[in-house]
């Protein structure tokens, strides 16, 4: 399969909102287009990211870290190896365990919060399928 990242993928791992700062999700949603991934804040040893999805992301995995997806706007499907795809609608979440191949897909623009270990590689650190 040897998939590549979407041509318009942009990842900003710089923390935008430090502690004791209001995180303005509506402003972030206005300011970004798909496929944008913004690190919002750090909580202990985890990062909270906002992703704007539209279309298919490549299959990938995070060898040593779990990844939590929570839909704020729109709807996504998570293809996960060795199980049926999981459809997530607004205010639904799902955790993909470490070392499991997965890919998010969204037929239309969707906004997703992700909670991941600090230092995770958002595009995956395992081989793409």
Predicted regions and their residues:
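Ligand-binding loop in jelly-roll beta-barrel domains
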Residues: 98-126
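Well-ordered beta-strand positions in beta-sheet-rich domains
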Residues: 50, 85-87, 101-103
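A cytosolic small-molecule/anion-sensing beta-strand core signal
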Residues: 44, 72-73, 89-90, 108, ...
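A short, N-terminal "cap"/entry segment at the start of jelly-roll beta-barrel domains
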Residues: 1-49, 128-129
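Short acidic-glycine-tyrosine-enriched beta hairpin
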Residues: 82-98
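Structural motif
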Residues: 47, 56, 68, 75-77, ...
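Conserved short histidine dyad/triad with adjacent acidic residue
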Residues: 33-34, 47-63
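Short, conserved beta-strand element in jelly-roll/cupin
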Residues: 52-53, 62-81, 115
């Amino acid at each position: 399969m040897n998939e590549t990242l979407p041509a318009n993928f942009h990842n900003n791992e710089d923390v935008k909102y430090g502690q004791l700062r209001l995180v303005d999700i509506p402003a972030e949603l206005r300011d970004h287009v798909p496929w944008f991934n913004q690190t919002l804040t750090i909580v202990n040893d985890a990062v909270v990211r906002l992703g704007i999805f539209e279309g298919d992301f490549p299959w990938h995995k995070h060898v040593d870290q779990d990844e939590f997806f929570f839909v704020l706007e729109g709807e996504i499907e998570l293809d996960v190896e060795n199980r049926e795809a999981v459809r997530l609608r607004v205010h639904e979440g799902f955790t993909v365990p470490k070392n499991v191949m997965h890919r998010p897909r969204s037929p239309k623009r969707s906004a997703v919060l992700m909670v991941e270990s600090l230092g995770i590689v958002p595009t995956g650190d395992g081989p793409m399928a």
